[in-house]
A protein has these predicted regions:
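Cysteine-nucleophile active-site neighborhood
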Residues: 47-122
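Pocket-forming structural segment of enzyme catalytic cores
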Residues: 88-166
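Beta-strand-turn-beta hairpins that frame and shape the catalytic cleft
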Residues: 141, 175-180
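Short, surface-exposed beta-strand/loop micro-motifs that present aromatic residues
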Residues: 168-175
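Acyltransferase
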Residues: 182-207
C-alpha cells in the first residue's frame, strides 16, 4: 500500500486519482502511525520550502519519515516541492530539508537566462537517463509538467536520473538508494505520469 503523506500542501486528490486509475492501492494520511505502516511513501508538495518544513515539524512527521526511509528502507517518491524537501538545504527560506538525498535546492540563476526564459520555469520537457527503472516503458519523448523557481543541485552526478534545460541544464529527477525525487508533476502528466507511478509502485529497491 502506498501512503500519500498529507501535511496540508500538495495535489493530494490528483495524485490519489492518478494512482487509482493506474490500478495502484493507496491511501492519504498525515497520521504518523499510518505512515509507519506504509510499504511505500509519496511526499507531495506545492508552495514554499520553509513553510513546508515548518509544517512537517509541527505535525511530528520529520522524524517519522526519516526513520521509515533510513531504518526500514521504505521507498519514497518526492514530487515537485516534495522532491525538493528530500534534500539537505534550500535557498528558499535558507532552511534544512529532510536530508535524505545529498543535494541542495537552489534558485534559477537569472544571470544565465535570456529575456525569453522566465522564472518560474513552466514546461513539459524531460530527458531521462538510459535504463532508469522509474521511466521504463514511458513513451518518448517524455512529457512531464513543470512549474518551479528552484531546482535540484546534486553532489553526485550519478544521482541524477533525468534532466531538463531552462537557460542551462539542471537535474529534474534524482535517486539515492530507496529515495527518488522528481521536480515535475506526474499527476498532471497524463499517460507519462501514469506509467511513472506504475513503475514506482512496482520497482524493486533491495534492502
Amino acid at each position: 500500500m502506498i501512503t500519500i503523506i498529507d501535511y496540508g500542501l500538495g495535489n493530494l486528490g490528483s495524485i490519489k486519482n492518478m494512482l487509482v486509475r493506474s490500478g495502484i492501492k493507496c491511501t492519504v494520511s498525515g497520521d504518523p502511525d499510518v505512515i509507519r505502516g506504509a510499504s511505500r511513501l509519496i511526499l507531495p508538495g506545492v508552495g514554499h520550502f520553509k513553510f513546508a518544513m515548518d509544517t512537517l515539524h509541527e505535525r511530528g512527521l520529520v522524524t517519522v519519515i526519516q526513520q521509515r526511509v533510513r531504518e526500514a528502507n521504505i521507498p519514497l517518491l518526492g514530487i515537485c516541492l516534495g522532491g525538493q524537501l528530500i534534500g539537505r538545504h534550500s535557498e528558499e527560506g535558507d532552511v534544512a530539508g529532510l536530508g535524505l538525498v545529498p543535494m541542495d535546492v537552489v534558485a534559477f540563476d537569472r544571470a544565465r537566462l535570456t529575456q525569453c526564459e522566465k522564472v518560474p520555469h513552466m514546461g513539459w520537457t524531460v530527458t531521462p537517463h538510459a535504463d532508469i527503472p522509474l521511466f521504463a516503458s514511458v513513451q518518448q519523448p517524455a512529457r512531464y509538467y513543470y512549474v518551479h523557481s528552484f531546482h535540484f543541485r546534486c553532489d553526485d552526478p550519478a544521482a541524477e536520473i533525468a534532466w531538463a534545460e531552462h537557460g542551462y541544464r539542471f537535474a529534474s529527477g534524482v535517486r539515492h538508494g530507496n529515495v527518488i525525487g522528481v521536480q515535475f508533476h506526474p499527476e498532471k502528466s497524463h499517460v507519462y505520469g501514469q506509467q511513472l507511478l506504475r513503475n514506482f509502485a512496482a520497482m524493486e529497491f533491495g534492502a
